[in-house]
Amino acid sequence: MVSEISLPLKRQRYVILGLLLAVAAAAWGILIWQSVVDGQSMGPGMNMQALLFLIIWVDMMVAMMFPTAAPMILTFHRVQVEKRQRGQSFVSTWVFVAAYLLIWTLFGAVAFAAASGIQLVMKLSMLSMETTSRLGGLVLICAGIYQLTPLKTVCLTKCQTPMSFILTSWRDGVRGAFWMGAKHGAYCLGCCWLLFVILFPIGIMNVAAMAVITALIFAEKSLPFGRRIGQIAALGLIAYGLLAVLVPGMLPTNMQSPSGM
């Protein structure tokens, strides 16, 4: 890999951005291939064990979140380079990235455990397909409502303003960089977590749904009217959820057990 220190700042930014986008593109390629092999709209019940689920989850996070996190990552790197030019310590940007990704990986583990527990209860309760579809609709409604909450707004604002985050959350050293990456990952998680949860009823390997969610997250974070787009999406999620509750079978798939059926 090209050294971050040996290149001018502008070229370094291009290298880092290129690597982020290349990794994201490769992740998308793997997801598309996996969806063709296993079925695009499969729910979490794909006969997956925890490790396989986490591997696919991390791949999905890289594909969907790296492009939207790029402005923050590049801002962090620029500040680190400026510190080095002043003779201060330099920390690799990839420490920040690793911590950011760790937060999403931990969330994937929690999501897997929660989905496994919920699906075990559903299986023991012998719920009908109509009931599971309605539960999926409720997940969509909750995701839509969350889009309109103050907590969502606070987390989104933190994700939209990289320099503000730098000024209010900066810490020196490797531990500081790791802490900052984890904190920014937590803000992104707070902003987007329910948008990922809806993949469970819609289909964990539904590439079309992943593409729409990625576009929504990018628009929310990057466009001047991103907040308005998020509010419109919230109304759409609530409407779709209500439709799934009232008309069972409207979802591409029903939630199944992550550990298999």
PLM region descriptions:
Residues S6, L54-L101:
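Juxtamembrane transmembrane-helix termini in multi-pass membrane transport proteins
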Residues M48-M65, M129-I145:
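Alpha-helical transmembrane segments
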Residues G87-G117, C191-F225, Q231-L237:
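A small-residue-rich subset of transmembrane alpha-helices
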Residues Y146-V154, G176-I204:
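Alpha-helical transmembrane segments of helical membrane proteins, especially in multi-pass transport
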Residues I16-L20, Q49-F53, S92, F96, ...:
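Residue-level signature of transmembrane alpha-helical entry/exit and packing/kink sites
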Residues M1-D59, V81-Q85, M122-S128, P150-R171, ...:
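Histidine-/acidic- and/or cysteine-rich, low-complexity loops and terminal segments associated
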Residues L17, L21-A24, V97, G136-L140, ...:
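Residues within membrane-spanning alpha-helices of integral membrane proteins
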Residues T105-L120, T132-T161:
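Transmembrane alpha-helix/helix-exit interface in multi-pass inner-membrane proteins
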